[in-house]
Amino acid sequence: MSLTLESLNQKNTRSLKAVQTEVESINRIALSVDCVIFGFDENKLKVLLIRSDLRKFQSKWSLLGDLIHINEDLEAAAYRILKQRTGLSDVYLEQVQTFGSINRHPAGRVVTVAYCSLINIQHHKLNIFDNELHWHDINNVTDLAFDHQQIFDTCYRRLQKRIQEHPLGFNLLPKKFSLRELQNLYEAILGTKMDRRNFRKKFFAMDFLIDLGEIEQDVPHRPGKLYKFNYGKYEKKKKKWVGIDF
């Protein structure tokens, strides 16, 4: 007797109850969220770290993270954890990657999802609670708790790629900025020195800078012209914009 397509489909499928029973019988796996918050201040790229409250990692720094609640979406958990640990609420978090090495957490099987953000430190005030919370120069970040060094490195590489694909950096600058400040920002994030003439040539070619006809005031170096970013022009051209190749 030949089987119909419908009967074959029924034979190869499982009921919801069967799947539910299987899920309940599997060893529990916890899910957490870790937030990597980058900030720019004093021409340096920094990352926000908190002292680990786990005895095994006593005195080590860690990212901002915690387990998610059973009735909570991933993104909601990320914003809740960030708010609880830092007081920050008006930042944009972008999901980066999932980390699930078997032995990444000493308490058991914990899979974590990393979120990343880039903010202007001067525009955000931190609330310091029981744990130490500090901005650290990214060049001094080593030996973090758990697998947080790997998570940090991954998010940093993602940030370096993103800032060449999108003009994220302008949100970190004053509304009026000099080309010197702009170059300092990109050098800090990309971790490399750039040729001054070539850098300026690339940005002028994009035609997203507006010359304000003003110069810097009270600076210890030769005053430079002040510019602002033309967000309106960028919005019109962003679909065709291929980024900046340094």
Predicted feature residues:
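Core subunits and conserved enzymes of cellular information-processing
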Residues: M1-N9, F40-E42, V47-I50, N71, ...
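Acidic, metal-coordinating catalytic segment for phosphate/diphosphate chemistry
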Residues: S2-D34
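N-terminal strand-loop-strand
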Residues: V23-W61
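Active-site segment of metal-dependent pyrophosphate-handling enzymes
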Residues: I29-V33, E75-Y79, K83-L126, R162-G169, ...
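Short histidine-centered catalytic/ligand-binding loop motif
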Residues: L63-N71, N171-L172
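NUDIX/MutT-family hydrolases
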Residues: C116, K125-L159, I163, P174-R180, ...
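Short helix-coil junctions and helix-kink-helix linkers
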Residues: N184-K193
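Long, intrinsically disordered, low-complexity Ser/Thr/Pro-rich regulatory/activation regions
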Residues: I215-F246
